[in-house]
């Protein structure tokens, strides 16, 4: 018994199946192209219902009997439509992590720049402070050197003053400018001892001769000169040598004048005494 062959499919049916396969292939290529052009927009989605034209060709066994074996074999060989391999998504956190890293890096870089700027400012301020301290130290050093030099000068001046003071303690004070000791002194003229100092009236008869004392102008002149000599000696602050004073007194004055025959001293005679200081005093 020979098996009965299925009737040949109608040509219109073959054309429709071919168009359906072309449409499915075209949709698959278009979807793959869109997926490659927009990879970031791809999100894992659950299985969704495919449109009717993209669903696999599932026919009942009764319909398969009516399909041409050539067409059915090509369809079976082609198998279900396969989508091109899609890149596996790294997860939903990968875009967020990728978006956060540049932000974190920028913040860290900004913090580093701020820290470096603050460090430079502190370094510059510290350097300026050190420079000011160095200037103050230099000024203080110069002042100290000046004070040290002035101290040395004052020490030398004090030593010089001390040496001069020691030398001047044993010296005689200087004379005034209007006095010259080298100039010879003029001796005072005194009347000779034999000359009568004054003339008295003639003695009356029967009575002792009486002599009246008359002021002697020579004695007053001697007193004035002696006073001037004492003032000059006191002003000079120097004591005369005793021999010189004795010679001066011996040349200018006489100790006593001879008495008259009557035993009465002459009226012009002046009694002179020498005190302990060596200056003549007229009484």
From Swiss-Prot:
Output the InterPro entries linked to this UniProt entry. Answer: AP-1-like, bZIP, bZIP_sf
Region: Basic motif; residue ranges are 103-126
Q: Where is this region: Disordered?
A: 1-121, 178-283
Predominant localisation class: nucleus
Q: What keywords are annotated for this sequence in UniProt? A: DNA-binding, Nucleus, Transcription, Transcription regulation
Q: Where is the composition biased (Polar residues)?
A: 55-67
Q: Where is the composition biased (Low complexity)?
A: 26-42, 108-118
Give the record's GO CC terms. RNA polymerase II transcription regulator complex
- Record keyword Calcium present: no
Q: Enumerate composition-biased segments (Pro residues).
A: 1-10
Molecular function (Gene Ontology), one example: transcription cis-regulatory region binding
Q: Where is this region: Leucine-zipper?
A: 130-161
Sequence ranges assigned to domain bZIP in this UniProt record:
102-165
Subcellular localization = Nucleus
Q: Any idea what job this protein has?
A: Putative transcription factor.
Q: So what family is this one in?
A: Belongs to the bZIP family.
Protein name per UniProt: Putative transcription factor kapC
């Amino acid at each position: 018994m020979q098996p009965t062959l299925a009737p040949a499919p109608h040509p219109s049916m073959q054309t429709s199946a071919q168009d359906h396969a072309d449409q499915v292939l075209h949709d698959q290529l278009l979807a793959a192209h869109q997926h490659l052009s927009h990879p970031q927009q791809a999100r894992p989605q659950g299985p969704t219902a495919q449109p009717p034209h993209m669903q696999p060709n599932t026919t009942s066994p009764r319909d398969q009997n009516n399909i041409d074996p050539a067409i059915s074999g090509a369809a079976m060989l082609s198998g279900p439509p396969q989508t091109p391999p899609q890149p596996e998504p790294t997860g939903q956190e990968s875009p967020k992590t990728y978006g956060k890293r540049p932000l974190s890096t920028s913040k860290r870089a900004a913090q580093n720049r701020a820290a470096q700027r603050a460090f430079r400012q502190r370094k510059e301020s510290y350097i300026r402070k050190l420079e000011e301290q160095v200037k103050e130290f230099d000024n203080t050093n110069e002042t100290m050197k000046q004070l040290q030099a002035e101290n040395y000068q004052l020490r030398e001046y004090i030593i010089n003053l001390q040496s001069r003071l020691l030398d001047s303690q044993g010296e005689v004070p200087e004379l005034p400018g209007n006095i010259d000791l080298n100039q010879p002194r003029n001796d005072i003229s005194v009347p000779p001892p034999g000359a009568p100092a004054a003339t008295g009236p003639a003695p009356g008869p029967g009575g002792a001769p009486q002599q009246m004392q008359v002021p002697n102008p020579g004695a007053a002149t001697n007193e004035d000169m002696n006073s001037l000599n004492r003032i000059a000696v006191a002003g000079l602050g120097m004591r005369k040598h005793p021999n010189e004073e004795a010679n001066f007194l011996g040349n200018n004055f006489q100790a006593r004048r001879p008495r008259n025959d009557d035993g009465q001293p002459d009226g012009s005679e002046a009694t002179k005494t020498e005190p302990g200081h060596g200056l003549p005093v007229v009484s």
